[in-house]
């Protein structure tokens, strides 16, 4: 939180993190989309396809952005990560691999 104050109440956090996409499948990866209110939920073993590391907890949530930006919070570990670049990587494969590697390393350090 900010200056020791909560940013979101427990009820708000629970509501925002509720998966609302049902059985919607991500068209690119053919995995459950796990979409909540403006964020993605790490969830099951397909979390790396959603921009999270392979070692984030299922409770982690966040969103990736254009060109390789990513941001997530993992309530289980207390870790949050924001990765910003000054460029736009147009190689989707490299961009995805880098995001998963950075997220996995960060989660491993917290674990």
Segments predicted by a language model, with ranges:
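Catalytic loop of the DD-peptidase/beta-lactamase superfamily, centered on the K-T-G motif
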Residues: 1-111
């Amino acid at each position: 939180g900010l200056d020791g104050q909560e940013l979101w109440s427990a009820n708000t956090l629970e509501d925002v993190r509720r998966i609302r996409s049902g059985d919607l499948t991500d068209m690119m990866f053919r995995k459950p989309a796990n979409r909540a209110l403006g964020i993605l939920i790490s969830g099951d073993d397909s979390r790396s396809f959603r921009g999270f590391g392979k070692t984030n907890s299922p409770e982690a949530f966040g969103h990736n952005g254009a060109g390789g930006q990513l941001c997530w919070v993992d309530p289980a570990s207390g870790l949050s990560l924001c990765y910003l670049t000054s460029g736009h990587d147009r190689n989707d494969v490299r961009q995805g691999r880098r995001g998963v590697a950075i997220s996995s390393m960060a989660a491993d350090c917290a674990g």
